[in-house]
Swiss-Prot record:
This is ATP synthase subunit epsilon, mitochondrial. It comes from the Eukaryota. Mitochondrial membrane ATP synthase (F(1)F(0) ATP synthase or Complex V) produces ATP from ADP in the presence of a proton gradient across the membrane which is generated by electron transport complexes of the respiratory chain. F-type ATPases consist of two structural domains, F(1) - containing the extramembraneous catalytic core, and F(0) - containing the membrane proton channel, linked together by a central stalk and a peripheral stalk. During catalysis, ATP synthesis in the catalytic domain of F(1) is coupled via a rotary mechanism of the central stalk subunits to proton translocation. F-type ATPases have 2 components, CF(1) - the catalytic core - and CF(0) - the membrane proton channel. CF(1) has five subunits: alpha(3), beta(3), gamma(1), delta(1), epsilon(1). CF(0) has three main subunits: a, b and c. The keyword Electron transport does not apply. Belongs to the eukaryotic ATPase epsilon family.
Length: 70
C-alpha cells in the first residue's frame, strides 16, 4: 500500500483533479488584464445537446449553453 506522503495535495484536500484544474484555470483567467481576460472568459462557455430516452427511443434533443459560472 502506498504511503500518504505520495498523495497529491489536491486529493489530500478532498478535490478531484477536474475540480483542481478548474480552480487553477479560473485563477489564471482572473489574473489576466483586459482585453485578454474578456477573451478568455468568453471561451469558457459550453454548448451541448442531450436527449432523454423513453422506451428505448431518443426523444427530441434539447440544446443547452452553460457559462461555466456556478
Amino acid at each position: 500500500m502506498a504511503s500518504n506522503a505520495a498523495v497529491p495535495f489536491w486529493r489530500a484536500a478532498g478535490m478531484t483533479y477536474i475540480t483542481y484544474s478548474n480552480l487553477c484555470a479560473n485563477m489564471v483567467r482572473n489574473c489576466l488584464k483586459e482585453p485578454y481576460r474578456a477573451e478568455a472568459l468568453s471561451r469558457e462557455k459550453v454548448h451541448f445537446s442531450f436527449s432523454k430516452w423513453v422506451d428505448g427511443k431518443p426523444q427530441k434533443p434539447a440544446i443547452r449553453s452553460d457559462t461555466g459560472e456556478e
